[in-house]
């Protein structure tokens, strides 16, 4: 991993940590997979920090440019899945 995670200097240290946890979860879904409930809990916390759709899109686009991992596709798949499902990107 030779990239940095997008964040805002307006956030608290804990908020930055929680946003980074979200992007790390996206990486995990691509690399190993993750339980839907765990991913959704991490996403809910991310949305508490980033409630704006436009800011979410901006941050996720920056992350995808840097990493090649699509947060949008992961969350679309997770939202379509059922509780108990394992989410993994091919």
UniProtKB/Swiss-Prot annotation:
Which SUPFAM superfamilies does the UniProt entry name for this protein? BH2638-like
Name of one Pfam family that matches: UPF0223
Reading the lineage from the top rank, the first entry is Bacteria
The family annotation for this protein states: Belongs to the UPF0223 family.
Q: Which protein is depicted?
A: UPF0223 protein GWCH70_0965
Which organism does this sequence originate in?
A: Geobacillus sp. (strain WCH70)
Read off the lineage from the record: Bacteria, Bacillati, Bacillota, Bacilli, Bacillales
């Amino acid at each position: 991993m030779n990239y940095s995670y997008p964040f805002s200097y307006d956030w608290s240290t804990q908020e930055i940590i929680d946003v980074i946890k979200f992007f790390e979860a996206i990486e995990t879904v691509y690399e190993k997979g993750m339980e839907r409930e765990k991913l959704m809990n991490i996403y809910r916390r991310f949305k508490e920090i980033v409630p704006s759709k436009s800011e979410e899109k901006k941050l996720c686009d920056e992350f995808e440019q840097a990493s090649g991992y699509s947060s949008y596709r992961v969350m679309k798949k997770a939202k379509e899945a059922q509780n108990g499902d394992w989410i993994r990107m091919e």
